[in-house]
């Protein structure tokens, strides 16, 4: 909301969370009014300095409201060098709360990159067509891109939730290892008693025989 009147309207509507835009980040009256609902607050940091974020966070926490801080840069569209994913973990560590990204890049890559770092919230602008007229069309993704973004974020979340044990995977892949690994093989039939030299052998699939790392046990 951008005014106390808007806050009162949204209270009557029954919203379950509040977004404080960076332009309202120092608006104590709005913060006080929304605090009466005890709903979660999403604080955008698009135009705020660290000192200003400190003050906003303190005020919101003083009101006892659940808080998620959104890394954001108020440039439309935001170029990649200004997106600031480095701030995700910085904000999380500094304020010890949930952190998300409010993205104005107009690209789905940004949200995927943020998801790979680990975020609780991803906010994007969406347009029905990039040919439409409007102040944030250039900062928006299409409906089709939104679908891909959601699928990608869920895929990445699944990756991050499951750590891999390399030894366990190697054991699981034993049948494949036998197919793709190689064994020590003689290049030609050898007579009994022949002294085997390096030039007499090669490595070939499958890996069901003497392992290449055991080559020295065969030579001589």
Name each region found by the language model:
Residues 1-220:
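Catalytic cores and adjacent flexible loops of soluble metabolic enzymes
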């Amino acid at each position: 909301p951008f005014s106390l009147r808007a806050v009162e309207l949204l209270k009557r509507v029954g919203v379950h969370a509040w977004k404080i835009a960076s332009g309202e980040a120092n608006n104590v009256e709005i913060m006080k009014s929304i605090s009466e609902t005890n709903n979660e607050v999403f604080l955008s940091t698009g135009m705020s300095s660290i000192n200003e974020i400190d003050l906003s966070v303190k005020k919101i926490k003083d009101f006892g409201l659940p808080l998620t801080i959104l890394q954001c840069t108020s440039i439309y569209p935001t170029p990649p060098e200004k997106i600031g994913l480095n701030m995700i973990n910085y904000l999380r560590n500094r304020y010890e709360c949930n952190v998300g990204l409010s993205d104005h890049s107009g690209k789905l890559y940004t949200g995927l990159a943020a998801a790979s770092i680990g975020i609780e919230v991803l906010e994007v602008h969406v347009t029905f067509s990039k040919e439409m007229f409007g102040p944030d069309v250039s900062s928006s993704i299409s409906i089709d891109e939104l679908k891909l973004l959601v699928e990608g974020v869920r895929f990445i979340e699944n990756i991050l939730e499951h750590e891999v044990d390399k030894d366990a995977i190697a054991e699981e892949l034993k049948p494949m290892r036998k197919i793709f690994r190689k064994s020590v093989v003689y290049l030609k039939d050898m007579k009994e008693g022949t002294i085997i030299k390096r030039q007499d052998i090669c490595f070939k699939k499958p890996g069901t025989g003497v392992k290449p790392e055991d080559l020295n046990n065969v030579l001589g």
